[in-house]
Amino acid sequence: MDRTICPFFIQSFTMSTALKRLIPFLVPFVVFLVAAALGGLAADQPENHQALAEPVTGVGEAGVSPVNEAGESYSSATSGVQEATAPGAVLLDAIDAESDKVDNQAEGGERMKKVEEELSLLRRELYDRTDRPGLKRAVILSLATSAAIGGRMVSRTLRDNIPGYFVVINAILAAYYIRKVLTYRRRVMTKRQPFMSSVKNFFRRKPKDEGAGVDKASKKQT
């Protein structure tokens, strides 16, 4: 007897390498079959079945209430009195919120207009009380440029001693300050905007009218 069993175990432990590689794949498959069989047996027990006449637990409890075809929710005995909510109420709330937003924007626009008016008054007062900046520099540079040009035209010595770039630089600076003096009123009385901000505003898209959505929603409601 022992001589027959021992060679069997020895032969089973010395099986081929290919069969040993199949064992890790066969074991999970066998476990799955056993678990499925046990689950089927447990489901066939009569204790797990529920009569059709009995109400299903959970319905009407914990604030769960049935809903009719119109979308209104009825109050249940356990959840207390509940208000019926119609789908149109949600749309009306959205329209009211949008109208409030438009009103707030209109109030903000009126405030901005008042602020701009106050700033314009301050600019006018600044223009009346202050002298034009750069006026003295414009006069001095203009006189220096005119004297250098006249001296180079009259005297050969001044032509050799005064370089041409000196006259050009003085002429450019004089023109800059003359322009600054002449445009002082416009720069003070109007709102100034930085160069980069003006470039960004030029390429920026204009926002759409937010009130158009409210008008469309009101038309649909009517």
Swiss-Prot record:
Chain ranges passing through the membrane: 22-42, 162-182
Cellular localization per UniProt: Cytoplasm; Host endoplasmic reticulum; Parasitophorous vacuole membrane
Motif position, Prevents secretion from ER: 219-222
Key words of the record: Cytoplasm, Host endoplasmic reticulum, Membrane, Transmembrane, Transmembrane helix
Entry GO CC: cytoplasm; host cell endoplasmic reticulum; membrane; symbiont-containing vacuole membrane
Membrane topology annotation: Multi-pass membrane protein
Protein purpose: Direct host-parasite interaction occurs at the cytoplasmic faces of the parasitophorous vacuole membrane (PVM) and the host endoplasmic reticulum (ER) membrane via GRA3 and host CAMLG association. Direct insertion of GRA3 ER retrieval motif into the host ER membrane contributes to the host ER recruitment to the PVM.
Domain text: The KKXX motif functions as an ER retrieval signal that rationalizes association with PVM and the host cell ER.
Subunit comment: Homodimer. Interacts (via N-terminus) with human host CAMLG (via N-terminus).
Protein name as it appears in the record: Dense granule protein 3
Organism from which the protein derives: Toxoplasma gondii
